[in-house]
């Protein structure tokens, strides 16, 4: 008779701030769900934007990213209390004050912790750029992981880059932040079709059905 199965304990290795455009493509909420369920990381904040590229279709309503992110937290980890500040709906060059989301990033970076801080961004770099402009020493206290940028090595148009190109230019050219970039040619290797999403999510219990819809 086999012994009962046991879960192998997983220690927290990093603090993570998850930044994305949760009111845009559905991949943002799927990525957030994945991050919240990853036992080796501690999600300390969830920051969002509601921006669209020039000449594109209208984007999310201000507050919609914040609302969607909070709902995912309630579904998956209701006992946790990551900071979920207001969406940033103003492009980097038009900001007249530091966004709430950027302030949350700076506040978390100031905390004393044995866990290194990673900021994972799957949308525009607006919040990160504004935080780095406010306090350039932030670059020494966090590592940025960004899904964005054109095909390597030639570059070119890419959605997350186009959402706020000046923000990306500031982060790459005006800061000393350590950046792990996953450009178009890399993240397209992880593409899912609508049919696959329907099969995996809609049959994955109440939360999966909610996420798909």
Where on the chain are the PLM-derived regions?
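N-terminal acidic, glycine/proline-rich low-complexity segments
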Residues: 1-213
């Amino acid at each position: 008779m086999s012994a009962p199965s046991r879960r192998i304990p997983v220690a927290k290795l990093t603090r993570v701030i998850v930044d994305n455009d949760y009111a845009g493509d559905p991949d943002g909420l799927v990525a957030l769900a994945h991050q919240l369920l990853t036992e080796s990381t501690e999600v300390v904040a969830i920051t969002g934007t509601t921006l669209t590229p020039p000449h594109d279709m209208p984007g999310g309503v201000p507050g919609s990213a914040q609302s969607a992110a909070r709902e995912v937290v309630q579904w998956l980890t209701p006992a946790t209390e990551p900071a979920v500040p207001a969406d940033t709906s103003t492009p980097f060059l038009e900001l007249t004050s530091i966004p709430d989301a950027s302030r949350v990033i700076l506040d978390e970076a100031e905390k004393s912790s044995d866990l290194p801080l990673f900021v994972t961004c799957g949308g525009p770099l607006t919040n990160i750029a504004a935080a780095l402009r406010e306090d350039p020493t932030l670059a020494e206290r966090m590592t940025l992981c960004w899904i964005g940028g054109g095909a390597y090595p030639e570059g070119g148009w890419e959605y997350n880059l186009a959402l706020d190109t000046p923000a990306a230019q500031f982060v790459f050219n005006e800061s000393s932040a350590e950046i792990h970039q996953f450009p178009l040619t890399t993240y397209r290797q992880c593409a899912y079709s609508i049919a696959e999403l329907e099969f995996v999510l809609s049959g994955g219990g109440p939360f999966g059905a909610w996420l798909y819809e």
